[in-house]
Amino acid sequence: GSGLVGSEMCIRDRIKGKHLKAHYKTSIAISLIVIIVLVILRTTVTGQDSIKFIDDTDDQPIDQQNSDSIDLRYSNEYQSWKQTSDTTFRSLFNGNQQADILAEHPGMMVLWAGYAFSKDYLSPRGHMYSIEDLYKSLRTGAPMTPTSGPQPAACWACKSPDIPRLLTTTDAKTLYKKKWAELGNEIVNPIGCADCHEPQSMGLRMTRSFLKSAYKRNGLRIEDATEQEMRSLVCAQCHAEYYFQGEDRILALPWDQGYTVENIEAYYDSINFTDFTHKLSRAHLIKAQHPDFELFQMGIHGQRGVSCRECHMPAVGEDENRYNNHHIKSPLAMIDRTCQACHRESEEILRKDVYERQNKVYAIRMRVEEELTKAHIEAKFAWDKGATESQMKNVLKLLRQAQWRWDFAVASHGAAFHAPQEVTRILGSGLDKSTQARIQIMKVLAQLGYTQDVPMPDISTKAKAQQYIGLDMEAEQQAKQKFLETVIPQ
């Protein structure tokens, strides 16, 4: 079979049917009495309670009888979690360093013309930076008042354990429709223990209701998930494709018809969903977020029951000091603990195997990017020549389909390794639809009396591409700097 998850029955079979036989003991968190809870309460500037991690100092008062003030400064899990601040690892295509993706791929700014991602798109750092990096992103704008700015509060949904805390006193509809800046003084903790662990037992738990809701709509219950399944589902809470529903901006996962790129596209089409209208081509486009969980399930590791934990949080230490490393990062940074837990080849061979998959996917990704970029530019040219809505209808549909496939593959972290065959298939489909769109545009131009090649702008650098799509980056950066200096606490 193709390995695709295209129906409700496939979803049930995948979730309930396959488990990894681990090569090491799994009774870790509960048996280690040194693993205790993570938080003490502190009062924010608004006077409301907010979670804050105990700092690494000896002058913090600790009440071991109070679950709000239990010390886990010395646990291996907590200490390794703090290492998510490390930014020294770099692999062939990624790592935990903050690279400017737009500078590396100027065409992406044309693909996102009219959308905030054309302003700023950096590779992700560790969980420790989840709040800081959102502050600094040009995509969140420069709101100088709590009720201003371009983004909704829903953009905080996966950035902090403070969101589940706020949802205990405020319903999602009320919370998410607020402005992003309005929750700024409440969101103080980066992604951490409380996002995945129940404080009393340290067992795994769901803290994002939108994943529970998506499961329920497919006739499944999170409560029935096995421990092994939970080791991926806690990650899937945030590492999945999502969208904002309606004016209330309720965050939801589009899994109603399945997990594949076609399933999710069909769902979005059925509700007439669009993230943005392209500034050049006028196509109504969907912006993929990070369909990591979806694509992971379509690769051999996901199909064999391997969880996210085995490769991104491997067991380290020996005997009573054995624990799962909470310095979540690329498996390539610790091949001896990840790949070699199951595979007996050398680190060099295993790394080469990963890079070979990535290079092959990267090659076709660049083909799609080039064709799709030209298609948007040519579509604008056709509009400028007087094309009608009727003439461009099929072009716009093909552009929507092509860009969704490209973005689904590119936005997913680790897709080229998680599911190389499926990602290659998706990109191949995207290339086909991009080419079809360009052919249709040429036909439209011929009808309008134009039979020459469409002139292409110079978008060879980030600055040139942003200038071409009409962005005033100097003004954007100045506004952001003022925001950081006057609004964000130093």
Positions of predicted regions on the chain:
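Long, structured ligand/cofactor-binding scaffold of large enzymes
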Residues: P152-C155, D162
